[in-house]
């Protein structure tokens, strides 16, 4: 894909077919990067034919955003299944480059550099040798990504130390760029919850 996230409404689900195609070639080990467009505004454009079960409880764009998260969950589940079918050994790492804020404003789904939700994104790891679910609620700074990648893949470089997000601690404060300057992530206000309408 060329252009910005809004230049074409290509369905992220098409990446699953491309992944199947790449894994069919068994000639060498692979590192595959999938760049999904995800829930960018307007999230309704990202659903394509995905069902939206939230329309009766939330305003349309917020409902679309929630449905897009459901679609992402399904995508990751399908991707995990593809990897399990094709590979004896695999690891999958998912993260988002930024969060989205949801409000009842005229532009209800948007990136907001002044709330914690703009930077609090999931980091999901599955692998063929992971046998139990483990959840970590502490903040992990994105600057540790290269170390996490090394820890997960076994690829090593001289200048970066592997970083296990389950056990390794990073005592540096998490700093984020709020659109104007770097600020401590903890200084940002929390995102208020949008409760469903009881129609």
Each PLM stretch: what is its role?
Residues 127-130, 135-166:
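Non-catalytic, well-ordered alpha-helical segments in soluble enzyme domains
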Residues 28, 88, 154-158:
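Generic structural signal for secondary-structure transition and capping sites
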Residues 92, 172-173:
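Localized sequence-composition bias
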Residues 169:
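Short Asp/Glu-rich motifs
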Residues 71-110, 149-153:
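Metal-dependent active-site segment of extracytoplasmic phospho-/sulfohydrolases and closely related
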Residues 1-81, 102-103, 111-143, 176-199:
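Catalytic-adjacent loop/helix segments of enzymes that bind and process anionic phosphate/sulfate esters
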């Amino acid at each position: 894909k060329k252009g910005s996230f809004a230049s074409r409404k290509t369905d992220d689900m098409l990446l699953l077919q491309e992944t199947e195609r790449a894994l069919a070639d068994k000639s060498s080990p692979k590192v595959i990067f999938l760049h999904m467009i995800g829930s960018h505004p307007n999230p309704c454009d990202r659903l394509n034919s995905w069902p939206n079960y939230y329309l009766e409880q939330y305003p349309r764009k917020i409902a679309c955003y929630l449905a897009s998260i459901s679609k992402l969950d399904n995508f990751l589940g399908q991707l995990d299944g593809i990897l399990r079918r094709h590979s004896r050994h695999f690891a999958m790492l998912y993260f988002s480059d930024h969060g989205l804020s949801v409000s009842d404003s005229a532009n209800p789904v948007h990136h907001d550099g002044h709330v914690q939700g703009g930077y609090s994104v999931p980091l999901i790891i599955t692998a063929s040798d992971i046998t139990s679910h483990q959840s970590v609620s502490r903040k992990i700074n994105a600057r540790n990504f290269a170390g996490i990648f090394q820890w997960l893949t076994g690829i090593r470089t001289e200048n970066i130390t592997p970083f296990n997000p389950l056990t390794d601690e990073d005592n540096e404060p998490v700093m984020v760029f709020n659109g104007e300057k770097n600020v401590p992530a903890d200084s940002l206000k929390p995102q208020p919850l949008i409760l469903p309408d009881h129609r």
